[in-house]
Structures are given as structure tokens and as C-alpha cells.
From Swiss-Prot:
Similarity-based family: Belongs to the KRTAP type 12 family.
Oligomer status and interactors: Interacts with hair keratins.
Listed name of the protein: Keratin-associated protein 12-2
The entry's keywords: Keratin, Repeat
Organism, as annotated: Bos taurus (Bovine)
Gene Ontology CC: cytosol; keratin filament
Source taxonomy: Eukaryota, Metazoa, Chordata, Craniata, Vertebrata
Residue runs in coiled coils: none
InterPro entries found in the cross-reference section: KAP
Length: 124
């Protein structure tokens, strides 16, 4: 049910094809929470968001369980630790102190969702 499309030039750490959500063009999953436009899910007018296809740490916040859903997912507000655990936050909003302490490897792309297990050899 899931499909993917990474635009030309997309960063290597795009969500694997087996784990990207499908969504309709009217779905909030289309633009809400992927911070890199190159790695947004493909949309089809005949499909709906398949949140279960994507591990929680990679899902747009609109598809996350309520427990992990921030009110504003791609604004500077996400820098606040009250919204999401660091492993579920877009890397671009992870506090610099966390990045420097090893929560994220700096060699991995910074504008994609990724878990704290991200490493230099395998971002996903």
C-alpha cells in the first residue's frame, strides 16, 4: 500500500520505499512535518495516509500517536522539549547541545526525521 518518490537530488536518508506513507493531496500528511521538501511522501488522489507503514520516529507528526503529536511540528516551537522526545523530533529542531552530546551524528542529513540511533554508517 505504501509507495515512495524521492525527488532528484534527494538526500540519501529518505525513508525507504517500504516505509513511506501514501496520502491524498488533501491530507495533512502531504506537507506538515517533513522538514525537507525533497523527502515528502508521494501523494495520490486515490489513497489516504498510511501511518502504520512508517515507524513512529519517521512519521509526519499528523500521523503519530496522540501521545507524540506536537501542536506545531515544523516551527521553532519544536525546539521545546515539551513537544516530542528527541528521537521523534525533526533533527533540524534538536537542540545544539543535544547534537553535540552525540544524540545525532552530524554527518547525517539534518533536514529529515531520524531516530537517536542514527549513525554515520546508517542513518536509518
Amino acid at each position: 500500500m505504501c509507495h515512495t518518490s524521492c525527488s532528484s537530488g534527494c538526500q540519501a536518508a529518505c525513508v525507504p520505499s517500504s516505509c513511506q506513507p501514501s496520502c491524498s493531496t488533501s491530507s495533512p500528511c502531504h506537507t506538515s512535518c517533513f522538514t525537507s521538501s525533497l523527502c515528502q511522501p508521494t501523494c495520490s488522489t486515490s489513497s489516504t495516509c498510511q501511518a502504520t507503514c512508517v515507524p513512529v520516529s519517521y512519521r509526519p507528526a499528523v500521523c503519530l500517536p496522540v501521545t507524540y503529536k506536537p501542536t506545531l511540528c515544523v516551527t521553532p516551537s519544536c525546539q521545546s522539549s515539551v513537544f516530542l522526545p528527541v528521537s521523534y523530533r525533526p533533527a533540524v529542531y534538536v537542540a545544539p547541545s543535544c547534537q553535540s552530546s552525540g544524540c545525532y551524528q552530524p554527518s547525517c542529513p539534518t533536514l529529515v526525521y531520524r531516530p537517536i540511533s542514527c549513525s554515520t554508517s546508517s542513518c536509518f
